[in-house]
Amino acid sequence: MTLVATATLPTRYGTFTSYAFRVAGGDAEHLALVMGDVAEQPSVLTRLHSECLTGDVFGSYRCDCGEQLDLSLRYIAAEGRGVLLYLRGHEGRGIGLSNKIRAYALQEQGRDTVEANLDLGLPDDAREYDSAAAILRILKVTSVRLMSNNPKKFDTLARHGIPVCERVALAVPVREENERYIRTKQLKFGHYYFDENE
């Protein structure tokens, strides 16, 4: 993992320092948005966010990605300190944009999000988070409060010796358009979600 560029990034959430990283031996680039002092600090509020063009940019209701991104940046801004890693190459759980749209078409025919990927001969989830752990190491983040519903992220950070002190829930609205998607992730991937009545 190589740090290739850094610059100030003013946003509607506040001002971040942006760090662009390139994965060794590949074309993948990831972006870290950092607010405040995170080096050698305990329990840094952190989000590992998988790229999702349809959700993050266009506000698609098929998933909860865009709302999780927005909420994560709001939490970091409110605290005045934190890290958001925007992980490129994770589109459609790592299958790419075109294949994600093909999977959407299968979902419209009744397949769930996992079945659709498998029907296309693709993995149910091709993402890796080792790159995220490497970036956190470069940023000298020693422990995190992780904003995530995905247990795979917790496991990867633990394997790399980055303690997760707390899981910060990202409770975004379940909509008619994404309810089946969210329930499938909960049932098939063990994602953490709240019942709205809890």
From Swiss-Prot:
It catalyses: GTP + 4 H2O = 2,5-diamino-6-hydroxy-4-(5-phosphoribosylamino)-pyrimidine + formate + 2 phosphate + 3 H(+). GTP binds at R47, L48, H49, S50, E51, Q68, E91, G92, R93, T113, S148, K153. Keywords: GTP-binding, Hydrolase, Metal-binding, Nucleotide-binding, Riboflavin biosynthesis, Zinc. Pathway: Cofactor biosynthesis; riboflavin biosynthesis; 5-amino-6-(D-ribitylamino)uracil from GTP: step 1/4. It comes from the Bacteria. Its EC number is 3.5.4.25. GO terms for biological process: riboflavin biosynthetic process. The active site is at D125, R127. InterPro entries: GTP_cyclohydro_II, RibA, RibA-like_sf. It is an enzyme of class 3 (hydrolase). HAMAP family: RibA. Belongs to the GTP cyclohydrolase II family. Catalyzes the conversion of GTP to 2,5-diamino-6-ribosylamino-4(3H)-pyrimidinone 5'-phosphate (DARP), formate and pyrophosphate. This is GTP cyclohydrolase-2. The lineage of its organism: Bacteria, Pseudomonadati, Pseudomonadota, Betaproteobacteria, Burkholderiales.
